[in-house]
Curated annotation (Swiss-Prot):
GO terms for cellular component: cytoplasm; small ribosomal subunit. HAMAP family: Ribosomal_uS14_1. This is Small ribosomal subunit protein uS14. Pfam families: Ribosomal_S14. Coiled coil: none annotated. Part of the 30S ribosomal subunit. Contacts proteins S3 and S10. Belongs to the universal ribosomal protein uS14 family.
Length: 101
């Protein structure tokens, strides 16, 4: 199990990403716009740099919903490989079976 502080930190990052998503997208559009003036683009870069670091989506880490484990995460289920296996063996995931050949 991951520490509760790590889970809380990820939740905080998710809130920040949602809060600043529109502002970041607008600034990035200005930065990548070749028709904008150099001064506008430079101001957009500086404004983007002044935003909180954790408001960037790339700083988020996918974690297991049950344990908070960061590695072996399966997007389709939102769980780590260990918890997916346990749920599969209990028959809690419809249509998923252990492979046999």
């Amino acid at each position: 199990m991951a520490k509760n502080s790590m889970k809380a930190r990820e939740a905080k990052r998710a809130k920040l990403v949602a809060k600043f998503a529109e502002k970041r997208a607008a600034l990035k559009a200005i930065i990548s716009d070749v028709n904008a003036s150099e001064e506008d683009r430079w101001n957009a870069v500086l404004t983007l740099q002044s935003l909180p670091r954790d408001s960037s989506a790339s700083r988020q880490r996918n974690r297991c919903n049950q344990t908070g484990r960061p590695h072996g995460y399966l997007r389709k289920f939102g769980l780590s490989r260990i918890k997916v296996r346990e749920a599969c063996m209990k028959g809690e995931i419809p249509g998923l079976r252990k492979a046999s050949w």
